[in-house]
């Protein structure tokens, strides 16, 4: 259990509770979660964050009505800057998107502007929204994370409780720049404890990281309860603390739930995330 799992800021969330689905636009359905909940225990201050980054959401189930009442569909991408005061709780995001279903909008741009305005208000920070028609997306190939996959190691694991100390002694003598990938990241929703499945890409320059120790550390998230964004910041913080790289970027792409996938990245260098969906997305 995290130190803030029962924090009062989480008590009012619809997540984990029976809710009615509304199909008429309602911005009040969006619910914020303060980023400070997990940052404070990690010693991360909003005015001195050791990283920059964003939470990239893909919206696969977005529909509304045009002025003639004809349903419209699009696929959207949302980028919420990591400097925002809040992250957006995912079930509330899903309920909010459902409220577009029977609402008329003048145009695709009107939908985009509405999404951007409401999400900025909820996150209290910079948000950008891009919408694409299906014909602009069809035929795009499934992407893959570049880098060396560390998953096929012949090691025994019997403990699946989170332990940052598994990274202790992981930094070697040799200085390298490399990209490591694992598809074995699995954590659990902070509230419902439903499993969240993800792939993670770690690019760094600095003391060479022991791949066995890194894999054991990533697998230890298996029983850990935290939101996607919080897990990525924890990974960034722990690798920084134990391995002290000169430069570090951590990027995770999670499988979708409720028509949404969440793909957070954090970096202290020059990093541009590839946004193509992976095989499990």
Swiss-Prot record:
GO terms for molecular function: preQ1 synthase activity. This is NADPH-dependent 7-cyano-7-deazaguanine reductase. GO terms for cellular component: cytoplasm. It comes from Cronobacter sakazakii (strain ATCC BAA-894) (Enterobacter sakazakii). Substrate binds at residues 88-90, 228-229. Belongs to the GTP cyclohydrolase I family. QueF type 2 subfamily. Catalyzes the NADPH-dependent reduction of 7-cyano-7-deazaguanine (preQ0) to 7-aminomethyl-7-deazaguanine (preQ1). The active site is at residues 189, 196. Its main location: cytoplasm. It comes from the Bacteria. Homodimer.
């Amino acid at each position: 259990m995290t130190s803030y799992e029962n924090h009062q800021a989480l008590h009012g969330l619809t997540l984990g509770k029976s809710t009615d689905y509304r199909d008429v636009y309602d911005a009040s359905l969006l619910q914020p979660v303060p980023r400070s909940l997990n940052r404070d225990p990690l010693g991360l201050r909003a005015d001195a964050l050791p990283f920059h980054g964003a939470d990239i959401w893909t919206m696969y189930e977005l529909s509304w009505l045009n002025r003639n009442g004809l349903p419209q569909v699009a696929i959207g991408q949302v980028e919420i800057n990591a400097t925002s005061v809040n992250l957006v709780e995912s079930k509330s995001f899903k309920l909010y998107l459902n409220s577009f279903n029977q609402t008329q909008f003048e145009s695709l741009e009107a939908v985009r502007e509405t999404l951007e305005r409401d999400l900025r208000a909820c996150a209290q920070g910079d948000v950008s929204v891009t919408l694409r028609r299906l014909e602009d997306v069809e035929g795009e190939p499934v992407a893959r994370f570049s880098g060396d996959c560390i998953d096929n190691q012949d090691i025994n694991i019997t403990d699946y409780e989170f332990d940052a100390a598994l990274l202790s002694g992981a930094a070697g003598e040799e200085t390298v720049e490399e990209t490591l990938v694992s598809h074995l990241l699995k954590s659990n929703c902070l509230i419902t404890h439903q499993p969240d499945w993800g792939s993670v890409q770690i690019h760094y320059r600095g003391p060479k990281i022991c791949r066995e120790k890194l894999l054991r550390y990533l697998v230890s998230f298996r029983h850990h309860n935290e939101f996607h964004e919080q897990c990525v910041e924890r990974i960034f913080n722990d690798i920084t603390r134990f391995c002290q790289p000169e430069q570090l970027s951590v990027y995770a792409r999670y499988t979708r739930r409720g028509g949404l996938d969440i793909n957070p990245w954090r970096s202290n260098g020059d990093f541009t995330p590839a946004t193509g969906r992976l095989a499990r997305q």
